[in-house]
């Protein structure tokens, strides 16, 4: 299903906390508009390239009941896909070139940041955070080489909670090569700049300035219809934010704040 009812710009302009002035001043938005137009909307052969694999990560103690419930929705909507929950034991056997850096990380969620890039680089497929609920299958996006989702657009931020990729995509190779620091001092900014959203966004644009084939960063409606900014408000029906094109709903557990 190709969603053509609204343009990329229309979707982001209707997003929570949209800032027209910031959007107009950032050349990154023009790049995202172009990727969406050329790699998603344009008629093309849509044969599968991304492997039918779903990867999730849970390190440490047993995952909460809600996470188990959300995880089941991914298997339910993708009955023919391979599903893998990566635990501490699995990570022991994963090929991690810079294992010393991984072992030095003290925040469990930041370890997960580190691992998702290596897992997708080696195996391909779709990585999904454990607090995501699947609303519809992702099969019709597998013709792409790489996809991710945009956050709530003041500045361009690409979120890392849901990423699809072929193995050894240039973006992932660039990330793994340049991920040389991973410190957590209690500041989310430090984490975001070394392994998280800000780091990922920087690496993404460094690559797509040259390599644009099959790459799309989808508007928030696709994977993040429920805004992080309103998750703490009382009596909010998060499902009321879901759109016809929404493939997933992020419940924003923000578990990294509590897991060090």
Name the predicted role of every residue range.
Residues 1-112, 130-260:
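Glycosyltransferase-associated regions of secretory-pathway enzymes
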Residues 113-125:
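Small-residue hinge/turn detector
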């Amino acid at each position: 299903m190709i969603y053509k009812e609204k343009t990329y710009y229309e979707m982001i302009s209707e997003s929570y906390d949209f800032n027209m002035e910031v959007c107009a001043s950032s050349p990154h938005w023009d790049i995202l508009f172009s990727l969406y137009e050329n790699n998603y909307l344009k008629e093309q052969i849509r044969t599968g390239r991304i492997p039918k694999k779903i990867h999730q990560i849970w390190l440490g103690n047993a995952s909460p009941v809600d996470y188990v419930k959300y995880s089941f929705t991914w298997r339910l909507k993708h009955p023919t896909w391979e599903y893998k929950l990566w635990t501490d034991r699995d990570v022991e056997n994963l090929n991690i070139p810079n294992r010393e850096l991984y072992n030095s990380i003290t925040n469990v969620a930041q370890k997960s940041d580190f691992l998702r890039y290596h897992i997708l680089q080696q195996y391909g497929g779709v990585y999904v955070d454990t607090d995501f609920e699947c609303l519809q299958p992702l099969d019709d996006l597998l013709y792409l080489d790489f996809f991710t989702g945009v956050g709530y657009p003041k500045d361009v931020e690409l979120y890392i909670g849901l990423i699809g990729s072929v193995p050894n995509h240039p973006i992932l190779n660039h990330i793994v090569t340049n991920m040389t620091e991973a410190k957590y001092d209690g500041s989310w900014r430090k984490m975001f700049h070394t392994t998280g959203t800000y780091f990922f966004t920087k690496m993404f644009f460094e690559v797509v300035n040259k390599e644009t084939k099959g790459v799309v960063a989808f508007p928030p409606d696709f994977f993040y219809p429920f805004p992080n900014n309103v998750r703490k408000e009382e009596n909010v029906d998060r499902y009321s934010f879901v759109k016809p094109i929404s493939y997933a709903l992020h419940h924003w557990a923000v578990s990294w704040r509590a897991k060090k």
